[in-house]
């Protein structure tokens, strides 16, 4: 008798234990999270390797012992007679799982086991087997738990979930053993006469695994490489008899399996995979929107089992929430009486379908914590719940804002403006319109607001927006804006490269809606930029902390004599150049990449007009010191005055809400102060008077 360990994903151990007991009724099994242990014969281990649809690995225990030091790992491994398991001409690899007080690195643990194996061969044969990470003949695994090491021979080789029919995948594929677990948990595995539908099939894994079940095809029947193939104690005759028996048990299925996806390319991949698995004829494939899928003809009951998109990224939720809501409505209309099982890592998406869950199971899909949620599409769940926006406070306020702004917009020459700015505290977002796109910025919720509640409110916003503003869900960009805490205000948030051209008062600007926290244009400074354009004719202009150069563009359009644009970021300096090119501006325009503070200290040129809109805080690696606008603004203005001609103006602005201008310190620089904050607030920012402060500081002649 031998001791074996069979592994699977966490959450599937009880299912795996049931499967093993069914395959080998005489076995007594013990479960641990993600593991099933049993004592038995090699034949039973072979049978599990061949037939288990839920296992990842089947491993034979070779040795174990308590570990107080790294040398104990070596000694425990050395107690195994490795020459009885594989020859010096074989290749091998060592995996190591777990850690202890003396082995806290898996590579180090694997190395100690490898050294013990190699040293044993060298001592006996003055030669050693080679290590190969690519298709090794023998795979050894060390597992450390609570200072106890167990050394195993992995009979599986590669993980058993790899059925070797999947040559290509779609996005976020579900692993084969997870697909089988879904089929079991859904109830279909024990009710295969009922039809099975996967309306978001991706690479087809769920449908293919179902077809393999229906035909009683052993999942590993086509596997060619095993961890025991070159094992010296392998019983080839026994193994061949198990293969022959498995081939004899294949049946012609009598069930309906339907798989579809909206993506034709993905459906083609699913067909190729089904063909490779030998079950193409047992699955009906179709290219169709999930919301348009209807039951197979003549079937009023059945199972829908699917792995829909999870929406791991915030930006994806804007498109997925309306999709799930519409899909839920479609399911209630067309699939009444059916059972629905969905795998997700985002339970909130399923809540938007407005159905009550019958059962939920936690499991791991790879490294992702997921839930398999079962719904019964019965009378209770098929009631169409109210989705009207007529009683939605957010939708009503948004409609009110749009109506109010519509009159103002007729006199404005822009297609980018704010339509909502946390008007209702419970809907704590800002919404900006850029042409046919919306950018939704979620402000960090107060600590006293539960995260689940804040998320629910955000989802209400996302669902309402396409209906109220008439913008497609896929053209809504989501961002999260937390309060600044000592870091630069410009942050990368994704890598989607959604570029857009907008216009404002005769100027054009290139924006990036997705790659940074800010888009490239500060909408609250729309009036400020107009004022700059009106004040700079025939003047030498300096724009510090210039960002993407929008103020510089307006200065050039205002016929400034020269415009110098300075920013610390190469990205933004290049962006500013592109904005100038977009407006066909050519002339004495200089673009400088530099730390504005250091550059200003060393610069001697004279200007008639200087625009300064620094960040509130910054600790960029490119800066020698930290920056705090409240603490440092007088020192900044002192250096700016050195570059200002008598009678010249500094337009100074910042967006620190509690900022207080040091009037005494500024006056001592010879500057006359004029607060123009109220004058620079656009209509769409009137309800947020502290969005920025703005002053014109004139140098006394």
From Swiss-Prot:
EC number: 2.1.1.173, 2.1.1.264
All residue ranges annotated as the THUMP domain in the record: 44-155
Functional description taken from the UniProt entry: Specifically methylates the guanine in position 2445 (m2G2445) and the guanine in position 2069 (m7G2069) of 23S rRNA.
Gene source species: Pseudoalteromonas atlantica (strain T6c / ATCC BAA-1087)
Keywords of this entry: Cytoplasm, Methyltransferase, RNA-binding, rRNA processing, S-adenosyl-L-methionine, Transferase
UniProt-annotated location(s): Cytoplasm
SUPFAM superfamilies membership: S-adenosyl-L-methionine-dependent methyltransferases
Pfam families linked: Methyltrans_SAM (PF10672), RlmL_1st (PF22020), THUMP (PF02926), UPF0020 (PF01170)
Record's keyword annotation contains RNA-binding: yes
Enzyme's top EC category: transferase
GO CC annotations, alphabetized: cytoplasm
Catalyzed reactions: guanosine(2445) in 23S rRNA + S-adenosyl-L-methionine = N(2)-methylguanosine(2445) in 23S rRNA + S-adenosyl-L-homocysteine + H(+); guanosine(2069) in 23S rRNA + S-adenosyl-L-methionine = N(2)-methylguanosine(2069) in 23S rRNA + S-adenosyl-L-homocysteine + H(+)
The protein's name: Ribosomal RNA large subunit methyltransferase K/L
Protein family per UniProt: Belongs to the methyltransferase superfamily. RlmKL family.
An annotated Gene Ontology molecular function: 23S rRNA (guanine(2445)-N(2))-methyltransferase activity
